[in-house]
Amino acid sequence: MAITDWHENDRPREKLLKFGAPHLSDAELLAIFLRVGVKGKSAVELAQDLLDHFGSLERLLNADEAAFCEAKGLGQAKYVQLKAVLEMSRRHFESGLKKGEALTQPEKVARLLQHHIGHQSREIFGLVLLDQQNQFIQFVPLFTGTINQATVHIREVLKTVLDHHAAAVILAHNHPSGDPTPSQSDRDLTHQIQQGLQLIETRCLDHIILGDHGRWYSFTQQGIL
């Protein structure tokens, strides 16, 4: 049955307008993005097939170009459209961080980082740079390693802080394994960077590790920093 034959309250677009986006399922939201289905399948049915194929909405949104474009019903035009939407979302979120509010809550930092390094297949280490009032300046990715290890040079960390005139930093990296629990090497690295930052009188406020499914670990929240 075509979506146009559904009851008005069940059609994704009409449902969103009447009840709001939070009331739609992942498949319904994706169907609005897709706009049309394929032969024999409505946009909602195609959307559900794609979610099943990728395993989750998060994995679909973060799929690389090759994996995304080879899926039935998608393609390069949709890939470009999706990346543009995600980039607009990131810019919108970051614009709200630059309006004078201190960025010290681990939850908000983790949300920021999801836009940058969430669900990457390789480990990425970066810095959230803050000013004297702990207001957001910029996120700077610094090092990319293998799935199991990122090589971090403290000299480059300090140079980045000085180049951006940051007064405080939050360390950040992802665990592609999905488990955000820090390893002993994560703890040792954090301590070494913290000592280096002290030499240039820069505060290290936290180290956030991202896992999967929205999980994250805060060194400050756990009393390590």
UniProtKB/Swiss-Prot annotation:
<keyword id="KW-0482">Metalloprotease</keyword>
<feature type="binding site">
    <location>
        <position position="186"/>
    </location>
    <ligand>
        <name>Zn(2+)</name>
    </ligand>
</feature>
<dbReference type="InterPro" id="IPR046778">
    <property type="entry name" value="UPF0758_N"/>
</dbReference>
<dbReference type="InterPro" id="IPR037518">
    <property type="entry name" value="MPN"/>
</dbReference>
<protein>
    <recommendedName>
        <fullName>UPF0758 protein Tcr_1917</fullName>
    </recommendedName>
</protein>
<dbReference type="GO" id="GO:0006508">
    <property type="term" value="P:proteolysis"/>
</dbReference>
<keyword id="KW-0378">Hydrolase</keyword>
<dbReference type="GO" id="GO:0008237">
    <property type="term" value="F:metallopeptidase activity"/>
</dbReference>
<dbReference type="InterPro" id="IPR010994">
    <property type="entry name" value="RuvA_2-like"/>
</dbReference>
<feature type="short sequence motif" description="JAMM motif">
    <location>
        <begin position="173"/>
        <end position="186"/>
    </location>
</feature>
<dbReference type="InterPro" id="IPR020891">
    <property type="entry name" value="UPF0758_CS"/>
</dbReference>
<keyword id="KW-0862">Zinc</keyword>
<comment type="similarity">
    <text>Belongs to the UPF0758 family.</text>
</comment>
<feature type="binding site">
    <location>
        <position position="173"/>
    </location>
    <ligand>
        <name>Zn(2+)</name>
    </ligand>
</feature>
<feature type="binding site">
    <location>
        <position position="175"/>
    </location>
    <ligand>
        <name>Zn(2+)</name>
    </ligand>
</feature>
<keyword id="KW-0479">Metal-binding</keyword>
<dbReference type="InterPro" id="IPR001405">
    <property type="entry name" value="UPF0758"/>
</dbReference>
<dbReference type="Pfam" id="PF20582">
    <property type="entry name" value="UPF0758_N"/>
</dbReference>
<dbReference type="GO" id="GO:0046872">
    <property type="term" value="F:metal ion binding"/>
</dbReference>
<dbReference type="Pfam" id="PF04002">
    <property type="entry name" value="RadC"/>
</dbReference>
<feature type="domain" description="MPN">
    <location>
        <begin position="102"/>
        <end position="225"/>
    </location>
</feature>
<dbReference type="InterPro" id="IPR025657">
    <property type="entry name" value="RadC_JAB"/>
</dbReference>
<keyword id="KW-0645">Protease</keyword>
